[in-house]
Amino acid sequence: GGHMNAAGVHCVTFLLMAKECGVEVDEHTLQSSLLQFYRFAGRGNVAYGDGLPEGGMVDNGRTTGLAFAMQAAANLHPDGEQSVYAKARDISATKGFYSTSWLFHGHTGGGIGELWRGQSMGLVQDKRPDAYHSFMDGRRWMYELARTHEGIFGWVSTWNVSYTETATERRGWGNRIPLIYTLPRKQLRMFGAPP
């Protein structure tokens, strides 16, 4: 057996959010998986597999996924925004945001990394407003082109992240693009809305 942390980090987020909603969650599973991922915060990129944190810049969304898990953990912790999990969220979101300045860089043509990069900045926009606005101003053209005439979203590209791939056909993840705009409004609990 092995770990696939790129997917597993979202399972931790789910467990934490389920617990906050009152669902009975196995405490050992929750605590051991939270420990597994918390150890990556501030130490590089979340590893793809069962290993140490990875070096390098491009993380393809893994470290931002960790930031969302840490947001969910901070929501449960009595210290909330003063907790170690809130600090881990900010560190991970900043790392995810600054993971690369290259547009569409990474495997899958970079489309996945671009989805997470904007969302990571949305998590720390209050603490890094200048960086957030610089990012949004610099990428606005790309987000505007991502909206199709049908009202769906997908990256405009001849790579493997084009409209037909991300918006309607085999992959629907292009529809996550609007979260880059809506996340900073903090209307969902995972994005910082009050309970």
Feature-to-residue mapping (PLM):
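Extended ligand-binding clefts on enzyme/binding-domain cores
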Residues: 1-115, 122-134
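Terminal, non-catalytic domain-edge segments
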Residues: 76-78, 83-94, 120-195
